[in-house]
Amino acid sequence: MRIGVVNDMPMAVELLRRLVLSTGEHQVAWIATNGREAVEVCRRDLPDLILMDLAMPVMDGVEATRRIMAETPCSILLVTASIESNLADVYEAMGHGALDAVDIPSVGIEGNASSQSARLLTNKIATIGKLIGDAPTKAKRRMSRAAEPTPRRLIAIGASAGGPAAVAAVLSAFPVDFGGAIVLVQHLDAQFVPGLVDWLGQHTPLPIRPARERDSPQAGTVLVASSADHLVFKSVQQLGYTPSPKDNVYRPSVDVFFESAAQWWPGSVIGVLLTGMGRDGARGLRQLRDKGHLTIAQDRATSAVYGMPKAAADIGAAVDILPLSAIGSRIIEACERST
């Protein structure tokens, strides 16, 4: 891949340059020292992937991500110091379409990256490379009702790039007494899930927490996949995690969860596929539709990255293709109709 580096610190730039070249599979397309410069360079030389810092002069990484995804969309990996202390910015950038985030590798005495932190970054780059091969970027292809103790309706949501903001928009539409059980599979490292849960909790009156082994979906509660393994139903209404299929590049996989819900959930399912790169979730959404469940895909105009919803639309997996602003109300309408 051709990779752009956006960072204002010379030592960090050199470290990232070495790591990009160390695999022998990638090249540094260009280096920008602030967000505005990156936006301008992308207009004339769009790389396959951008390694984007967050805190920079002139224009920060959040605003640069927003502008790049609006003007010349491409894959963006946030690489910055201390993600834990910048979670709000991380999720805002992901809401604009950044794929993932990782701490910049620590530097040893000799100025080299520590092996563990360097391996984490190169693994993420390799994973994104597989996603890009699976689905090119857009630029390259230029209700309110009483809660039930045992829910009959499962709201299964899948999302990837741009997902946090899209999920927040959907959840914010639900009333405090919403009766459906909600399970979210968002492509995100497990270490960031607690921060995502806290951030989403600011946008919904519903309780929200990471999904644990043997959890049961509860009416009016949001459970979020929180492992590098796949979230599945291991029995009727009981969740768990499994490493299989091990060769699935998407971890946790939306397809795996949707297919599991189609097999095990005893009531009705509303499958929702939001913005994201690649095709994950399309096949599972189709399986839900084939079993008579309501399925919804986000439309092109409101998707930060129109990959996963497009894949669903292409195979006829979605009963409804809706703008983000209409998805929450459509779910509420369907739930009220079934009461």
Curated annotation (Swiss-Prot):
Keyword Phosphoprotein: yes
Keyword Zinc carried by entry: no
CheB-type methylesterase domain ranges (all copies): 149-338
Localization of this protein: Cytoplasm
Any one GO molecular-function label of the UniProt entry: protein-glutamate methylesterase activity
4-aspartylphosphate sites (modified residues): 53
Pfam families: CheB_methylest, Response_reg
One annotated Gene Ontology cellular component of this protein: cytoplasm
Keyword vocabulary terms for this entry: Chemotaxis, Cytoplasm, Hydrolase, Phosphoprotein, Plasmid
PTM annotation, UniProt: Phosphorylated by CheA. Phosphorylation of the N-terminal regulatory domain activates the methylesterase activity.
EC nos: 3.1.1.61, 3.5.1.44
Domain of life: Bacteria
Protein name: Protein-glutamate methylesterase/protein-glutamine glutaminase
Organism of derivation: Mesorhizobium japonicum (strain LMG 29417 / CECT 9101 / MAFF 303099)
